[in-house]
Each structure stands twice: as C-alpha cells, then as structure tokens.
C-alpha cells in the first residue's frame, strides 16, 4: 500500500485527470491514469476484464480482495498527467508496467525506469517549468 499519500496537482491550462491504483489486499498491482471525472467507468472496465480473466495482473479468483483507489487528481494537460503517472510507477513499481523509452511500457530493469524518469524530468523542467503557475498539494 502506498500509505496515506494523496495529491492534487494543478499546472497551466486545466483538464481533469487522475492517477489510480488497483490493489489486491494491500499489494499495489496496477497504476494507471484516466482523463475526465468519471473514474467509475474506468473501474468497471477493469472489473469486467478481471471477471473474464483477461486482466494480466489480477485473476478472477482474487476479485473479493480487489480495491480501486484514486492516488492523485491532476488538473493540467495530458503531459502532466502522464508525468505524474510515471512518477507513481517509478516510486512504487507495480506489476503492471515499468517506464522505458518514453511512452513504451514493458518489463525493464529498475535502473532503466529511473533513467527514463530523470530524462523526462529534465525535459519537463527545460521546456515547461519556467512558464507555468504551479499548485501542488499533498494530502495525508
């Protein structure tokens, strides 16, 4: 479990999105992102795949232990939503994916994930940081 850390992030022009986690018991198995306010639709898509045993990381036999939780609300553009999602993936290394080569998610070494995140951070800082009004709030 990530603990009690939750965040709200607002940068630049605003769309609403969220980074969410799917837990089996206290184990974080999946981190994903979703644009829009209706997170229940995305949750029901995951649950349908789990029930049909089509989900790669959660089996239908574990359905009673499955918990869906919003980890971070993002009020920004798509780039920031992806950045926050990659940050959570890098920090908590769920089974679903690892950061490698930008938007390509695949199994990789932890050092590859860290290097990709550092490159993304540098790109973010150089191209966007100076021109944005930033509000970042951690909620416990």
State what each model feature region is.
Residues 139-140:
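Nuclease-adjacent, charged terminal/linker segments that flank catalytic cores
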């Amino acid at each position: 479990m990530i603990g009690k850390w939750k965040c709200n992030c607002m940068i630049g022009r605003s769309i609403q999105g969220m980074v969410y986690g799917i837990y089996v018991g206290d184990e974080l198995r999946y981190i994903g992102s979703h644009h829009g306010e209706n997170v229940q639709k995305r949750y029901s898509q995951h649950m349908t795949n789990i029930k049909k045993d089509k989900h790669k990381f959660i089996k239908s036999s574990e359905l009673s232990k499955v918990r869906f939780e919003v980890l971070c609300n993002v009020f920004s553009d798509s780039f920031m939503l992806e950045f926050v999602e990659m940050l959570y993936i890098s920090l908590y290394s769920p089974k679903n994916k690892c950061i490698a080569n930008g938007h390509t998610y695949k199994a990789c070494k932890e050092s590859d994930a860290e290097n990709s995140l550092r490159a993304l951070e540098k790109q973010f800082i150089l191209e966007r940081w100076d021109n944005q009004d930033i509000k970042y709030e951690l909620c416990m």
